């Protein structure tokens, strides 16, 4: 057995690390693991080429060793499933960021994305914006109401020194850490999701 085949399980175990990486970080998005993804792609291609070479020998009636065809195929499927789970979980979290942060991602989140993920976020944002603009005569902002409102105004506390904030009626409000305010629910919904404000019960 070649050293490459002996190492088959090693890369399969690394592929599982992609899934565990997301499971261990449920509340944050880890940086895209470019190197590990590259190794997984490389190993799938390597195993595929080895199996293809064996199949060619079988078709040509040449001596061959087919004992590793199925193990290699199983390893390829395992690596692929892990990679798909990794990409799908990241995609779901990136979509949730659009609802949490709006169209502008914090630097800490953007820096964790690869170029393709940034492109996906931008395209998802554009699609959502087009959909909202086509609802009703003036469009509807679906990001404003994550739950049915109980009142038009809510009591909120600022969790950081945010600075000046303008409500929809033009009122200027200074949001300083621990300051209390009564604000229109629709105006502060996004800031609540971003962690700038919290509801005071």
Swiss-Prot record:
InterPro entries: GINS_A (IPR021151), GINS_bundle-like_dom_sf (IPR036224), GINS_Psf1 (IPR005339), PSF1_C (IPR056783). It is found in: Nucleus. Pfam families: PSF1_C, Sld5. Keywords: DNA replication, Nucleus. Component of the GINS complex which is a heterotetramer of gins1, gins2, gins3 and gins4. Belongs to the GINS1/PSF1 family. This is Probable DNA replication complex GINS protein PSF1. It comes from Caenorhabditis elegans.
């Amino acid at each position: 057995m070649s050293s490459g085949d002996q190492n088959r399980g090693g890369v399969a175990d690394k592929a599982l690390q992609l899934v565990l990486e997301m499971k261990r970080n449920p509340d944050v998005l880890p940086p895209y693991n470019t190197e590990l993804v590259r190794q997984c792609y490389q190993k799938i291609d390597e195993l595929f080429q080895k199996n293809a070479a064996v199949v060619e020998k079988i078709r040509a009636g040449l001596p061959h060793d087919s004992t590793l065809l199925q193990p290699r195929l199983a390893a390829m499927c395992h690596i692929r499933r892990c990679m798909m789970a990794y990409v799908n979980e990241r995609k779901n979290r990136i979509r949730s960021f659009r609802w949490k942060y709006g169209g502008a991602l914090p630097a800490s989140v953007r820096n964790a994305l690869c170029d393709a993920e940034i492109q996906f976020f931008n395209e998802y944002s554009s699609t959502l914006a087009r959909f909202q603009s086509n609802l009703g005569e003036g469009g509807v902002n679906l990001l404003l109401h994550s739950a049915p409102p109980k009142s038009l105004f809510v009591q909120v506390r600022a969790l950081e020194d945010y600075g000046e904030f303008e409500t929809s009626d033009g009122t200027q409000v200074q949001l300083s850490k621990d300051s209390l305010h009564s604000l229109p629910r629709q105006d502060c919904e996004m800031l609540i999701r971003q962690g700038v404000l919290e509801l005071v019960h």
